[in-house]
Amino acid sequence: MQRVSRLKREMQLLTAEPPPGVSCWQSEGRLDELQAQIVGGANTPYEGGVFTLEINIPERYPFEPPKMRFLTPIYHPNIDNAGRICLDALKLPPKGAWRPSLNISTVLTSIQLLMAEPNPDDPLMADISSEFKYNKPLYLEKAKKWTAEHAIQKNKGCVETDGKTPENKNLKTSHKREALSAQENLEHTKKVCL
């Protein structure tokens, strides 16, 4: 019961006051399966990209962290090819930093910061980490290329996904709405902050 009421509050807050460049919504109307989008930050190799994440909420939430992974491929030392994310806030102590006082919004913001500032000393992808440390121009070039190939919206406001199936005709529409929401949220924040 605590999990459901907490998730409802968090989703209301994420809808009313999302972090800049972030949007989050229920997947198929299920409260324990969410999707989020993060807009790549300015002056990063991910700039202009919209990255979709899958979020699974465990039964023991908030005493156990949400499971998050990127659905959009991203070239990053702390994110592997399956989309898994190496971030302390997604792990329980003693190895991690998850606490029940953290929430989905906080973790999404932490992921956004990790995208802007990779941690090459705690990598999931050793080869990308080495590139980041010793050949940063090559890392930046590859990360920009991956962003252009996988995360840049081909049609204005549309995020292409592998989830488009005849059974789920509304998926494209909801992704279009959320992609615009994340981008509009970022643009609104820029206007307010300037």
Swiss-Prot record:
GO (cellular component) term, any one: nucleus
Positions of the UBC core domain: 2-152
Principal localization reads nucleus
Gene3D superfamilies given in the database record: Ubiquitin Conjugating Enzyme
Name the Gene Ontology molecular function terms of this record. ATP binding; chromatin binding; ubiquitin conjugating enzyme activity; ubiquitin-protein transferase activity
One Pfam family this chain carries? UQ_con
Q: Provide the protein's localization.
A: Nucleus
Q: Basic and acidic residues: which segments have biased composition?
A: 158-170, 185-194
Tell me the InterPro entries matching this sequence. Ub_conjugating_enzyme, UBQ-conjugat_E2_core, UBQ-conjugating_AS, UBQ-conjugating_enzyme/RWD
The GO annotation for biological process reads: DNA damage response; DNA repair; protein autoubiquitination; protein monoubiquitination; protein polyubiquitination
Q: Does the keyword NAD apply?
A: no
UniProt keywords (A-Z) are: ATP-binding, DNA damage, DNA repair, Nucleotide-binding, Nucleus, Transferase, Ubl conjugation pathway
User: What are the EC numbers?
Assistant: 2.3.2.23
Annotated pathway, please? Protein modification; protein ubiquitination
What does it catalyze?
A: S-ubiquitinyl-[E1 ubiquitin-activating enzyme]-L-cysteine + [E2 ubiquitin-conjugating enzyme]-L-cysteine = [E1 ubiquitin-activating enzyme]-L-cysteine + S-ubiquitinyl-[E2 ubiquitin-conjugating enzyme]-L-cysteine
Residue ranges for the region (Disordered) are 158-194
Q: What does this protein do?
A: Accepts ubiquitin from the E1 complex and catalyzes its covalent attachment to other proteins. Catalyzes monoubiquitination. Involved in DNA repair.
Family (UniProt): Belongs to the ubiquitin-conjugating enzyme family.
Q: Under what name is this protein listed?
A: Ubiquitin-conjugating enzyme E2 T
**Biological classification of the source:** Eukaryota, Metazoa, Chordata, Craniata, Vertebrata
